[in-house]
């Protein structure tokens, strides 16, 4: 086992991975970072994300390394290169949310089968919210539903499995199976091709089809008032996961725990820990899981690195009951930023702001 696994972090170099800067590209820079003096490379999320993602936080499959980044083979090659230079690897993980995207099989299963499906309880949906009618409310339409139907913006399309999905611009929604789903045969093909588009009969049939689904499409302007699922802040396309459930936790963390046990990575950084239902319980559960995985490669309890993205208020400290190595350093960056700024510059900068804005924002 490499001694890099036991190096105490002194500085990390964060690498933002995407199709234009892959794991292979990162491997070419290992020598530079080693000479720079960092102890660990800190990687942005490597799970499968929305195609073309430039950041990786819109993941659609956390169980596989994104092929756009080079896949697991490239990740292992980067790890080997880092080890050869005495560096460790930290991996950013995203347990709070996933992207609502047709490539997300968990999400599409939820749309197709509703609360009683295999993944019906995996996402944080309040199925019994007042006015929801036991359905998931999706504030995704750019106009009211009736107008969207009349304008031909909701259409049936064939999918790769030989079935049907519903499309609204670049958004795709699974349909319930059986009689609740799309019509069959030549009638369905004609409808999907637009044979009934624009007719009252066709609009009524589409409305009836939508009423049989486990979700209801609503105008985005109603989102804040009617949305009945937890989001990443107010981003409708990022749907919160219920990592407090053991089955969800296992599925989301299977890849990083395996990579840790096999010596590919040395620890994790948890994105948006405060977004989770039970941050304290989550950190404690993750610590136990990391310890179990680390033991398989000879690490002592608490040795696998665990950092959390925790934005501390000026009078806030990291909870002592959280068994982690600390935050990702936003509080430290604030202190460094304050050190590098001359407090005497506040008055002239405020004056410049006032003149540039014509008095707007004065005193702020």
Which positions does each model-derived feature cover?
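N- or domain-start disorder-to-order transition segments that initiate the globular core
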Residues: 229-231, 236, 241-245
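Short linear interaction motifs
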Residues: 145-147, 250, 362-363
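Acidic/aromatic-lined carbohydrate-recognition and catalytic surfaces
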Residues: 2-226, 230, 262, 272-357
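A conserved hydrophobic secondary-structure block that centers on an alpha-helix together
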Residues: 268-270
